[in-house]
Curated annotation (Swiss-Prot):
This is Alpha-latroinsectotoxin-Lt1a. ANK repeats lie at residues 462-495, 499-528, 533-562, 567-597, 601-630, 634-663, 667-697, 702-732, 736-765, 769-798, 802-831, 835-864, 869-898, 902-931, 935-965, 968-999, 1000-1029, 1080-1109, 1112-1142, 1146-1175, 1331-1361. It comes from Latrodectus tredecimguttatus (Mediterranean black widow spider). Insecticidal presynaptic neurotoxin that induces massive neurotransmitter release at insect (but not vertebrate) neuromuscular junctions. Native toxin forms cation-permeable pores (with high permeability to calcium) in lipid membranes locust muscle membrane and artificial lipid bilayers. May bind to insect neurexin-1 homolog, insect adhesion G protein-coupled receptor L1 homolog, and insect receptor-type tyrosine-protein phosphatase S homolog, and induces neurotransmitter exocytosis both by forming tetrameric pores in membranes and signaling via G protein-coupled receptor. Residues 1-35, 1196-1411 form a propeptide. Residues 1230-1249 have a biased composition (Polar residues). Keywords: ANK repeat, Cleavage on pair of basic residues, Exocytosis, Membrane, Neurotoxin, Presynaptic neurotoxin, Repeat, Secreted, Target cell membrane, Target membrane, Toxin, Transmembrane.
Amino acid sequence: ACSSPEVSIFHFFVYAGSFVKNFKKMKGSSAISKREMSRADQCKLLAYTAVGYETVGNVAADIASIEGANLVAAPVAAGGHLGKGLTDAAMIAMDCSSIPFEEIKEILNKEFKEMGRKLDKNTEALEHVSKLVSKTLSTVEKIRVEMREGFKLVIETIENIATKEIVFDINKIVQYFNNERENINSRQKEEFVAKLQEPAPGNFLLYLRNSRTSESGTLYSLLFRIIDQELAIPNNAGDNNAIQALYALFYGTETFISIMFYLVKQYSYLAEYHYQKGNLEEFNTNFDHMKIVFQDFKFSLIGINQNTKPLVDEVLNVLNNVKNKSFIRNVQNKLFYDLMKQTESLLELKKEIANMELPIIDETPRLSISISFKERSDDKPVDTPLLKWDKGKEVKYAIQFEQDGKFSKISSWSKPVTVQHLACPFISVDKDRRNRLIFRQFGDQIPELVGTLRGSQVEFRDIHRDLYNAAQVPYAREALSISRTLIQNGANVSETFELGRGAIHAAASAGNYDVGELLLNKDINLLEKADKNGYTPLHIAADSNKNDFVMFLIGNNADVNVRTKSDLFTPLHLAARRDLTDVTQTLIDITEIDLNAQDKSGFTPLHLSISSTSETAAILIRNTNAVINIKSKVGLTPLHLATLQNNLSVSKLLAGKGAYLNDGDANGMTPLHYAAMTGNLEMVDFLLNQQYININAATKEKKWTPLHLAILFKKNDVAERLLSDENLNIRLETNGGINPLHLASATGNKQLVIELLAKNADVTRLTSKGFSALHLGIIGKNEEIPFFLVEKGANVNDKTNSGVTPLHFAAGLGKANIFRLLLSRGADIKAEDINSQMPIHEAVSNGHLEIVRILIEKDPSLMNVKNIRNEYPFYLAVEKRYKDIFDYFVSKDANVNEVDHNGNTLLHLFSSTGELEVVQFLMQNGANFRLKNNERKTFFDLAIENGRLNIVAFAVEKNKVNLQAAHRGKTILYHAICDSAKYDKIEIVKYFIEKLNESECNPLHEAAAYAHLDLVKYFVQERGINPAEFNEENQASPFCITIHGAPCGYSLDCDTPDRLEVVEYLSDKIPDINGKCDVQENTPITVAIFANKVSILNYLVGIGADPNQQVDGDPPLYIAARQGRFEIVRCLIEVHKVDINTRNKERFTALHAAARNDFMDVVKYLVRQGADVNAKGIDDLRPIDIAGEKAKAYLQSSRFLRSGHSFQSNEIDSFGNTIHGISMSARTNDKLTQQISSKGTRSDSNSTEGKMHSENVHVRSIDVNGALLLLDFMIRVFASKKTNFAPYGSRIKTRSAAEAQAEALIMTERFENLLSGLIGDPIPDSIDFSNVHSKIYKAIMSGRRSVISEMLCSFAEEYSKLNHESIKQLLSEFETLTTTKASEIHIEESVPYAPFEICELKVNSNVSQIK
């Protein structure tokens, strides 16, 4: 069943929906048949997520201390997965076991083997290295696990030929690394080491070390091929090929980092392994390997200086390059967004690696050892033979540095010395700030640590290790005799060696309590002496089953509850775990013993004692008061463990002692749950016979009952036993609404279905996702169940939440008999799911001709029904290349050349999506490849437009297109090359130019016009095209074309960051930035002006282009004004300081040019900026003389033109600013004064537009003082605030009467124009402008300028009558006055009418609209 259903039916039952969606985007529009994925892949995708792995890993650590942990861990991990995972009835029906039991067991076995290989902690000379590397490796592997599915997707869908080859090679390396690593990790310690040390050339570690070299085919070289060839830089938002390459680059880089830390970890392990074995030469060799690998890979990853190309930096540069692409926000590729989430992790790894140093001492000790057997007066000689000290045997020594837990390599051995009649020589070494560890070796025997010199110590006697060795001699008398001799000759009973263990620990391990007594007599503190892991002599004796030594230590008042460091074991934990009954009995007889002490996982000695054959458990249950219901950290009680280990006798003892039968663990799993899951019928029977057992107990989150689990795990005998119990509730549901009938139907258990229905199970009940038992029975393997369910009243038209009916499933799965049954019971053949998918779509998509025939014969109109993606049955048959269904549809008059509303045939559609196999299928079956759509495009055109190189190459190479045929006024080849450049399809461009050696059009011009940087670089760098060249045929240079952009482009405004990037790139290749770049002799500057490219113009000037260089006698400013390029004009004047009155060869200014063409925004701007409105060009023509209608009206309305001349010099106002353009006569002309002072006087212009233009001009004529006063007035009106101009008072110069008169005139005129522009003709008689002028004049002369605002308020009564539009106009005027945007004016919410109250105006309903 799993091998055939189509994705669209199930949507992977919601869980895989997003994966399918993105998979389809990667492949194109084709549907995905489930037959394309293996069952294992489907099940993994649906069920086994990272949640499961995390659960398993945690359980392995928690359970590891239990004897028989492998029996317990898998069910507990499965229970955790059930509690957190994505189990669903539909998944179960597909026979994708919702709990991947075998995978869980496999992972657990690896975890336990890893623990079994773990070397004795704290013997580790490289312990800190191991911790550091393991932590980073774990981080990297987590990222790789998260990215693994995405990388598989890339492998399956990648199309680009160049990228595909590289990615496949990367995949080979990745797969070999993953597989061989798993192979090695699955082995026990000795085999593991042997595998790591295989001789060359098959040595795995050597192979991995080679991956950082630049040799062809290595991982490092492959990653740099992607980088150097820029395969990971997308050209547009739809460039999936580049996104795939980017993903492969990132995943490959993470693998490269993983390889680095894996190598360091394994060389560290090997070094430590040999250190503990005493193979010091091998330790040194692997120490060097570890160090060199770390340094080499670190250099490759992050470099050491600016001259290197470190991999991580290069990858981050690529990522940043991609992120900065302007189109990147339009990318719809899930892989890309997944990748962006991981970018931060790569940055963190880079920092971590950069700051990382191996915690080692990178210095090998210089051998400087003196060995002396000479007798000394203050030390007694020790005669040979003694232990290893035999006459004639050679002995030698070596040194190792240690400081703060860091270790060095070991020095070379000293020259061997032959032992004579004395043992235990004196050893002298050089002084050093670091500790010096001294090793000795007799002949070819294993070296051993004999002492440590600390600080200023330079000498010691090699006798202490001999005491340690003597304490563990198996013969008690001999051990005691030698130990006594050594102690008498100066051996230190407190000296420690490997693991921090001394002679007392050795005696405990061997059970030599006489030696123990001798040692304690010398130093009673040895009684509680702990080694580096916290093991005391009592721990060691208990774990070694040395009961006599245990009793000896207890007799000396040893602490029986002492705990180890990390595991928190007491001696009783160790004895119980190993089922050591005598030691256990000795310990529990002690009054002070803590029977319920919990280790780091929360297990008590009772927990650890329970195994399949434990006798200790019975002792602890019967003979002690141990708490029997105590829980571990994961909530396991002793009864849970007894159930999981199938220990019925202990279970009975626990139940008899009052164990809580219904206690759940952390996930709510009771002992009965575990018994049902594991199929332990005898245990289930025992538990069900207990008085208070809860057969309906549910887990915490998912609410699984024991019956659910028995059915789910197909433990049929257990399920039937549970069904026989009268207390069972068969209608209980999980939190997903799954009841036992759903599970029985899904798993194909007909007998259970029959029994459940006999007990009145509800056949119509739906799960929370809308699945009925009938749905699940159809999906399942047993085809008898649907017939039985239908007979019992199942609804044949039930819909899942996704709208899928049983008929959909039967059609998609090809179950014709069930399909006929459903039809006979009234199933709706036109039922649609949420994607408008009908059963006919499912049948076609999955290749079930028999069902297709049934449906079409029943209703021929089904031939034309479309789903939400506009796919109709014939389309799907073509897409899936099902020849039998295709032929059937053709026999029913389906037309392979039928067109849609856009004129596209199936060949067009599948060419667009790059489905080469489908295109081939269509052509083999009569598709006409010459047909054109409504845009006159063939399948070949669409393949080019969408970058489908595979279709293009097929069409060319199979002669499906005549490249020399006429097409749109040129040849097909011409348009093919130009269009591929236009649409930024670099691979297709390269195909034509490199493979076919064709270059009929000039593709660089197209690439430049559309600002495709990568294509431009390709033509300039690889093809050697000169970007500055132009001629009669190519009338503009590529550089010029880049600046200007496509004639119409994709938008009218092509001034984008992409285009500027291309300009920046090409500007370095241009010999003269001020040179001509087209046949009309334009410069780059003038081209930027014609194209209205402000940012490009700014860039060009910034790199040396001359903003004043004339073209055919016209300066750039004149050209910009002539073209109406307002922003260009403004930029030239304000940013690049071009003279506003610069003239062309006919002495015309920019104002002439703008006025002639009625470009009013430019005209107004130039006037405001002080352009000479009376400038005369050829024939004494002023701007007004050649102006268009609008410009002429505007210029006429300006009172600057009322006198025959303008200022000969500029006046300096009271703030030191120049007042431009004020007519001298305007300040002294009495006639004008009379005119302005007369009541109701209007502007000369009858045009409202003229009035507004005029007053816009005047605002530039008021000096700063006047502008500030008007601003004060406006602020009062609009914000209920008064601007304080006091700071400026001291700088106001005294005015002459003429000056004050002129200023008052200007301000009065300004106020008049403001009002007339706002409220229109006539201005009420109540406003006397001569009076206004008089008061302003007096205020100026008196120096009391602050009263002007109050005075203006008194004349503003008419403002209270403004309507909404007038208010908007007023705001606009205020913007002109102050450069403050009207939208920025804030009106206090609490005082909306305050502005009007200040001027004591009438308030009406319109006033609130000011907001």
